[in-house]
Amino acid sequence: MRNNRRRWIVGVSAGAIAAQFAFLRGALAAGSVEKGVYRLRGDVRINGTPAKEGMDVRAGDVITTGPQSEVLFVTGRDAVLIRANARVEAQGAAGALVLSGLRIVTGAVLSVFSPGSPRTLSTPTATIGIRGTGIYVEAEEARTYACVCYGVADLVSVMDPSARETVRTSHHEQPRYIMGAGAPQMLMGAPVINHTDAELIMLEGLVGRRPPFFSYYPTERNLSGY
């Protein structure tokens, strides 16, 4: 498994990783970025209104992205990247700037959450309880893909709550599919897809942290050693 992860790391652009090292140095030196929308591309809306950099994301907000669009925002000590063609509902006390979780109706979300702050991600087929975790989720009607990139998460099937698993990882070891109605098995093993260490380094850097796998990249000049 370790060799498989190393081969996957090689597939990540060395240039992208190098750029994130530089970004992380600057982020840690400057401190955390301002809360709210940090970066966006394409058609991004919050409650139907076109989003702008600096806009707050509050509990109760609905974030949507169009084709070839994405948005990255910071809330509390958490950072969230929503990919194209997504609908995500921010959860928590009405109007709060610190969220208790996200409901991912459709689309893909990569997020990092501060240690010691339980959060819940929900999709049409899964409820995911997370604790200081980096996690990538793709929500479809028929199934949910979840990669706990590092940390601990409780995966529970919406269709059969007795089908559950606690996943503990340090570097993408146990991706899962959580299936919808009619599937013979509710939780199934899955490959690592559609997200990179570079993105996780960037997200953690925005909130002044480093991901636990950071030591896998010992120097900026030697990014292909795995």
Report residues per predicted region.
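Flexible, surface-exposed loop/linker segments and immediately adjacent secondary-structure boundaries
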Residues: 8, 12-18, 23-59, 66, ...
